[in-house]
Amino acid sequence: MKTIIAYHAVTERPLLPGQVILMDAEHQNGVGRRVAEKLPLVERIYRNPAAYRADGLEHHTAVTLRELAMEEVRRAKYPQYPSRMACLYVSRTLEEAEKWADFFARIGRPTYAVVKLEITGRCFIGDAERCFPGSPDRVENIRLAEKYWAYPQNGSGNAAVCEMLADGEIRVLETVKEINANL
């Protein structure tokens, strides 16, 4: 495992310097927890997709449909990458993390700070614009998930909105910027 430095826009709960976060199959993130809560509904949707309209799905239900497709494709074709349901979403640069923090604060999400991290684990840099609203059409969800994971890993940073997924041992090195919005 290689060690890298990255940054994170802290939402949901504060992170403190020296704190260690473990992200792996046994330690899911908020996405993973929300997906688990929606599994019974997803099973009903996939048993009878004609009874549901994509534009009528509640936000977290659409996200769950997307994330389950993302995980299915990752496990089958890209197991070397972190799971979106057991990772920390981080940024390669302070500037990227500040943009995410500003975005989260603007949409009303509790946003505490931007922190600098030391990550010993796996990373995947993807194009956040390739995230899609999940739909009752499982085949289409899988097709779109394949496009997300196939994003070229050339490090050129050519994606308009990068998202970096990191798992493993993640240590908070310092708080770089206090935000404290929508708390």
Predicted features, each with a name:
Residues 2-5, 11-62, 84-86, 95-113, ...:
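Conserved NAD+-utilizing ADP-ribose enzyme module
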